[in-house]
Amino acid sequence: MNILRLLLATLLVCLCLLTAYSHLAPEEKPRDDRNLRSNSSMNMLDLSSVSIVALNKKSKKISRKEAEKKRSSKKKASMKNVAQPRRPRPPPPAPCVATRDSCKPPAPACCDPCASCQCRFFRSSCSCRVLNPTC
């Protein structure tokens, strides 16, 4: 019986050490000069070549004009968005549930058009909540 306990204790210690060892970060091996040279040459070959092209004056002027056109079109689009009036909210349905009140599924819809019935805890507690305040 005493030998069995000693064997089980040894097995338990070995399992603990094995588990701890498996969770350790692997150590990096020191690299010598040959490994560094071969890795750097491989990395240089893997990169795609990049060609640098100088722009002439005409292409610079065209790109500036295009940029100005884009800026003016963005300004016009933003002015149109500001000028448009917001659409009116639809009137609430006659029998409705106020915001933050209980709205279990047989209950009518929420009064606020931006609110929705949100249920929690397996639909045991439901309430009307506004999810998007900028509706």
UniProtKB/Swiss-Prot annotation:
Coiled coil region boundaries: none
Disulfide cysteine pairs (residue numbers): 96-111, 103-117, 110-128, 114-135, 119-126
InterPro entries: Agouti, Agouti_dom, Agouti_dom_sf
Highest taxon of source: Eukaryota
SMART domains xrefs: Agouti
GO cellular component, one term: extracellular space
Designated name of the protein: Agouti-signaling protein
Gene: ASIP
